[in-house]
Amino acid sequence: MGGLEFCDQTSWYQIFIAFSLTYTPIAIYSLKVFRGTLAGIVNIFIFINCCVSFVYLMYHHSVTNTIALSLGAVIALVWGIYTLVKIVDWLVIRCRLCFLGRSYILAPPSHVDTSDGRQSLTTSLTTAFVVRKPGSTLVNGQLVPDFQRLVLGGKKAVSKGAVNLLKYVSK
């Protein structure tokens, strides 16, 4: 019985590169779908794939021209800077949530505190619109049963605006 050619000792990196080149575009597209911590993990995964692919091209293909190598270096550098900015933003928001209290450590960065718990908001990290009417409160178009507090980007929001339509901004 013959052995499998793709399982020999010298081709494990080729399998990794094949998966990397196949699944990195899928992971890049999934950044549109995911948000929060999962998007950060996918972003780090893409950065690692870009770096590994670039190192593979440099190390194993010495005949690669300088244009391809410089393009790979630019892509890895730009994605690395983007990943670093996203990690710093995530850490800043987590630190802000830690300053709000122990119960906020794992909370989403923008959420509404209600009597039922926390309700996540899909909004920008700086503004939210709250419409208060007798019997109901809408936050960015979402019905909130018992509005207690609004947190935007890890900061407690303060109200600015008219009586019924309130624009909340982070302190």
Curated annotation (Swiss-Prot):
Pfam families found in the cross-reference section: Arteri_Gl (PF00951)
Annotated TM spans: 11-31, 38-58, 73-93
InterPro entries: Arteri_GP5
Membrane association type: Multi-pass membrane protein
Principal cellular location given in the protein's record: virion
One Gene Ontology cellular component annotation held by this UniProt entry: viral envelope
Location in or out of the cell: Virion membrane
Keyword line: Membrane, Transmembrane, Transmembrane helix, Viral envelope protein, Virion
Disulfide bond residue pairs: none
Protein name: Protein X
UniProt source species: Lactate dehydrogenase-elevating virus
Gene name for this UniProt entry: VPX
